[in-house]
């Protein structure tokens, strides 16, 4: 631990930050354990104030030594517990801060020469993160290409919340993942191609809030959306950034909206790019209604000038309760006399 203190002092001197380590020890069998790691820097606006960049209760790491000689990294275990973080001014585009209960991963296949990463298993749990985007950063025209390819065999996220604040805090997106999982994900950072074989979400919650718009009394307020009890299953999810092409197969989707609308299930394939949306086998169910449809729509179908085409074939059975949610402005006698079936 004396040597660790010397290294921490040297790092503090070189970085201009206060870096300290409470204790270093060996974890069974031969893993390195670090406790009470702290990194503190002066505030970017108030030098007399200090910001905690990182405060880690415990870090455990096990890395194989021999592969390092051939520029490969084999991580048997990497585990962080009790993390408090704040990126302060390190990332100009955004400030990320929050807490992480547990972050762990194992990775056997990090190759610096080939620029590939294989993550065998990763877990993030009990995290609460806030992302504040900045509107004062000019675009970076000096970025160098990133050729890394990342393959994730299994990623689980439990009891985690993330809040994104748009510049000026005009818009806010709040997402909670009760239990989420990704299987067989491939991410090509150079070609901007992303693919996930399977995505599952249980007990999710999503809120979208436009703070500059007053709340509407409509069944669904597009400026203030709150979805709860979100359960989702997606197969064959892919996205190509260059063409804006999105493809997926919705296996199941259920949710509740704050205004009373409840979706019991949505399923079917979907494809979308910058010009067109296709849902050839859409099935939508609520507790009282169902809809089967085939949709082929140009995204400019409702444009005032030169509108595109819309093709829709549908069969449906609509229950009274669902219809009445969209007829709240109709006279009460009219709504009462509407037949139940």
State what each model feature region is.
Residues 274-292, 296-309, 324-341:
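Strand-loop-strand
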Residues 163-165, 171, 202-210, 255-257, ...:
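Short, surface-exposed beta-strand/loop "edge" segments at domain boundaries and coil↔beta transitions
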Residues 22-134, 145-167, 176, 181-209, ...:
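Flexible beta-edge/linker motif
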Residues 40-41, 138, 170-171, 214-215, ...:
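Short, surface-exposed beta-strand-loop junctions and turns on beta-sheet-rich folds
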Residues 51, 80, 93-98, 103, ...:
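Beta-propeller and related beta-repeat scaffolds in trafficking/envelope systems
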Residues 36-39, 251-255, 280-286:
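Short beta-strand segments that buttress and anchor functional surface loops
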Residues 1-16, 44-46:
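N-terminal type II signal-anchor transmembrane helix
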């Amino acid at each position: 631990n004396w040597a660790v203190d010397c290294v921490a002092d040297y790092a503090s001197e070189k970085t201009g930050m206060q870096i300290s380590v409470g204790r270093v020890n060996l974890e069974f069998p031969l893993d390195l354990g670090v406790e009470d790691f702290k990194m503190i820097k002066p505030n970017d606006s108030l030098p007399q104030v200090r910001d905690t960049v990182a405060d880690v209760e415990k870090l455990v790491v096990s890395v194989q030594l021999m592969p390092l000689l051939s520029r490969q990294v084999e991580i048997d275990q990497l585990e962080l517990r009790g993390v408090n973080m704040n990126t302060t001014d390190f990332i100009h585009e955004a400030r990320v801060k929050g807490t992480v209960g547990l972050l762990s991963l194992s990775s056997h296949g990090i190759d610096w020469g080939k620029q590939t990463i294989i993550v065998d298993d990763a877990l993030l749990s009990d995290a609460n993160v806030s992302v504040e985007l900045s509107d004062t950063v000019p675009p970076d025209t000096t970025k160098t290409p990133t050729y890394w390819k990342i393959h994730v065999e299994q990623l689980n996220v439990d009891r985690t919340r993330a809040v994104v604040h748009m510049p000026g805090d005009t818009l806010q997106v709040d997402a909670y993942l009760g239990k989420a999982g990704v299987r067989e994900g491939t991410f090509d950072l150079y070609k901007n191609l992303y693919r996930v074989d399977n995505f599952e979400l249980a007990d999710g919650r999503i809120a979208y809030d436009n703070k500059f718009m007053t709340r509407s009394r409509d069944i669904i307020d597009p400026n203030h959306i709150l979805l709860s009890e979100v359960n989702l299953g997606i197969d064959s999810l892919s996205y190509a950034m260059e063409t804006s092409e999105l493809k997926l197969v919705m296996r199941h989707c259920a949710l509740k909206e704050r205004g009373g609308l409840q979706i019991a299930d949505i399923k079917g394939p979907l494809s979308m790019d910058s010009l067109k949306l296709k849902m050839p086998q859409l099935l939508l169910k609520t507790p009282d209604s169902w809809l089967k449809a085939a949709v082929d729509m140009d995204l400019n179908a409702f444009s005032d000038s030169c509108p595109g085409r819309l093709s829709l074939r549908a069969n449906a059975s609509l229950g009274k309760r669902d219809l009445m949610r969209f007829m709240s402005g109709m006279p009460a006698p009219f709504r009462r006399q509407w037949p139940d079936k």
